[in-house]
Amino acid sequence: MLKKNGFIVWPVYFDSTKPRKWRRVPRKLAVEKPTLSEIVEAVKREGFSFTVEENAKHPAYWYEVQGRVIVQANVKKSVLLKKIAENLQKIRAEQSSKRRR
């Protein structure tokens, strides 16, 4: 969805526990229950400008406050989501390596 000159990115797009109907990336690129802060970090790593709306609720999950990120990018949304998903996997790998130490 395009809004305010940007793409709306919901955490559910990257959640491996959600059905494909709501996920926008393949399960192999998805992570389990991504947080809004992880998505913001992934967007920062790509260098896109963004706006965070912390109290937003996804229409399908109206009972959960997930938040959303509005990303201004000059690429297709599918490319944007794939880049964010790859960065989310890197972020999770870094977090798990820090925990092992």
Swiss-Prot record:
Protein name according to UniProt: Signal recognition particle 19 kDa protein
InterPro entries associated with the record: Signal_recog_particle_SRP19, SRP19-like_sf, SRP19_arc-type
Subunit structure: Part of the signal recognition particle protein translocation system, which is composed of SRP and FtsY. Archaeal SRP consists of a 7S RNA molecule of 300 nucleotides and two protein subunits: SRP54 and SRP19.
Organism in which the protein naturally occurs: Thermofilum pendens (strain DSM 2475 / Hrk 5)
SUPFAM superfamilies named in the record: SRP19
Entry annotated with the keyword Ribonucleoprotein: yes
GO molecular function: 7S RNA binding
Recorded superkingdom: Archaea
Family note: Belongs to the SRP19 family.
Function (record text): Involved in targeting and insertion of nascent membrane proteins into the cytoplasmic membrane. Binds directly to 7S RNA and mediates binding of the 54 kDa subunit of the SRP.
Subcellular location: Cytoplasm
One cellular component term from this protein's GO annotations in UniProt: signal recognition particle
GO biological process, one term: SRP-dependent cotranslational protein targeting to membrane, signal sequence recognition
Keywords of this entry: Cytoplasm, Ribonucleoprotein, RNA-binding, Signal recognition particle
